[in-house]
């Protein structure tokens, strides 16, 4: 694809992230790379409610973090962020009060155009449309006035529900799944990859396996944070069923949210190898070590609204991708992956066996996945969509 690059010497885009210690940072960094490809000046700015950045940003990308606090201290944190939010275009990541809410205030005060990106249905984490806040007067009092009261958290689902009603106030919306497009509208900008960096021709799989201490093992890789809806347990049950001593599931990065990782290790530790999170530039070297990339999403509201980045990880690196028939996944992979029913360890086990029995054939399918990724999910493909959005602001 030939991309027309336009010079934007004075045009700065501020990507506003609700919590840089959470998963939203990854989408922000990806969109930042796309905007840099279009020659915009990029700055990522957001609150930090945890101890450290969730993901290591691409080198040379400017990132500003403001300590995140609960109400009433959050008013001061917001003021600090608003004072430093100086992009010519404001690009809010996720419809949350801490990103989109702050960005709306900036838009109203400054008149600067505002784009909203959605890569999740935020309310799906709480049950979707069925979620209601119906406290007793006593509970409401506690939620507001107690030091750790629920309503003191700036992104409480009640506030998220309110702010979803303001989505139309954005000048433009970008989304990454059909589910979100049907619900909120917007322009499709997939969770793609820089296929020049993620190029399997630059890496030797055997050398990568040796570097990470994985030689002699057959590697299934899950690059990301395990959560119950992501189905990692189904892969581990499949490995238990196969009971072949050289099979391992390598989890890269782990979960910053809770102790779910430890629960997995406690139950299935013999099958798991954990690798630490790494900069995006190092990730292809890690992925090269895999024989199979697993994306075993379960059929939940949350999963249906997502475009798992792990898909484009595996596709870009020409790996066999084993995933489930959930949401957009079949359409993203086309005929280039291996699909099973969600929550079906038996089918996962069968496909693992099938892939390793015909590994040469599986790797050919992986190469077709890369070709598809270059065509549809590369940074260039994302940039083309995003350029059309920005040109209409």
Locate each region found by the language model.
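Acidic anion/phosphate-binding donor-loop and adjacent secondary structure
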Residues: 193-211
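Conserved acidic donor-binding segment of nucleotide-sugar-dependent glycosyltransferases
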Residues: 335-345, 354-360
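A short, well-ordered alpha-helix in the C-terminal region of glycosyltransferases
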Residues: 354, 361-376, 382-388
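Carbohydrate-associated surface elements
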Residues: 179, 192
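N-terminal subdomain of nucleotide-sugar transferases
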Residues: 1-59, 172, 237-242
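Nucleotide-sugar-dependent
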Residues: 97, 230, 279-286, 291-315, ...
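Nucleotide-activated donor-binding/catalytic signature segment of Leloir-type glycosyltransferases, i.e.
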Residues: 261-284
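Conserved donor-binding/catalytic core segment of Leloir-type glycosyltransferases
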Residues: 213-230, 236-239, 250
């Amino acid at each position: 694809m030939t991309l027309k690059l336009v010079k934007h010497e004075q045009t700065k885009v501020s990507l506003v992230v609700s919590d840089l210690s959470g998963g939203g940072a990854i989408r922000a960094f990806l969109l930042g790379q796309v905007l840099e490809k279009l020659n915009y000046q990029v700055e990522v700015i957001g609150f930090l409610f945890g101890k450290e950045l969730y993901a290591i940003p691409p080198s040379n990308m400017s990132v500003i973090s403001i300590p995140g606090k609960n109400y009433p201290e959050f008013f001061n944190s917001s003021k600090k962020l608003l004072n430093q939010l100086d992009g010519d275009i404001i690009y809010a990541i996720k419809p949350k009060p801490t990103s989109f809410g702050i960005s709306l205030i900036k838009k109203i005060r400054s008149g600067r155009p505002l784009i909203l990106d959605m890569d999740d249905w935020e309310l799906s984490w709480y049950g979707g449309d069925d979620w209601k806040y119906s406290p007793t007067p006593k509970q409401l009092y506690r939620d507001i006035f107690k030091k750790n009261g629920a309503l003191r958290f700036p992104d409480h689902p009640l506030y998220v529900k309110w702010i979803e009603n303001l989505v139309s106030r954005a000048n433009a919306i970008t989304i990454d799944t059909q589910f979100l497009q049907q619900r909120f509208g917007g322009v499709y900008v997939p969770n793609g990859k820089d296929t020049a960096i993620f190029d399997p021709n630059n890496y030797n799989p055997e050398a990568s396996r040796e570097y990470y201490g994985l030689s002699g093992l057959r590697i299934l890789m899950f690059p990301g944070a395990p959560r119950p809806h992501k189905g990692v347990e189904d892969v581990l049950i499949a490995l238990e069923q196969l009971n072949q001593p050289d099979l391992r599931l390598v989890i890269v990065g782990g979960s910053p949210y809770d102790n779910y990782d430890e629960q997995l290790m406690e139950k299935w530790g013999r099958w798991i190898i954990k690798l630490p999170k790494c900069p995006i530039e190092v990730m292809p070297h890690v992925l090269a070590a895999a024989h199979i990339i697993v994306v075993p999403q379960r059929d939940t509201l949350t999963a249906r609204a997502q475009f798992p980045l792990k898909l484009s990880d595996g596709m870009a690196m020409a790996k066999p991708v084993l995933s489930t028939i959930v949401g957009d996944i079949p359409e993203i992979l086309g005929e280039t992956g291996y699909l099973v029913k969600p929550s079906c360890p038996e089918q996962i086990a069968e496909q693992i066996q099938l892939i390793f029995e015909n590994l040469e054939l599986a790797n050919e399918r992986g190469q077709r996945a890369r070709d598809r990724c270059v065509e549809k999910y590369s940074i260039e493909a994302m940039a083309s969509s995003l350029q059309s959005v920005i040109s209409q602001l």
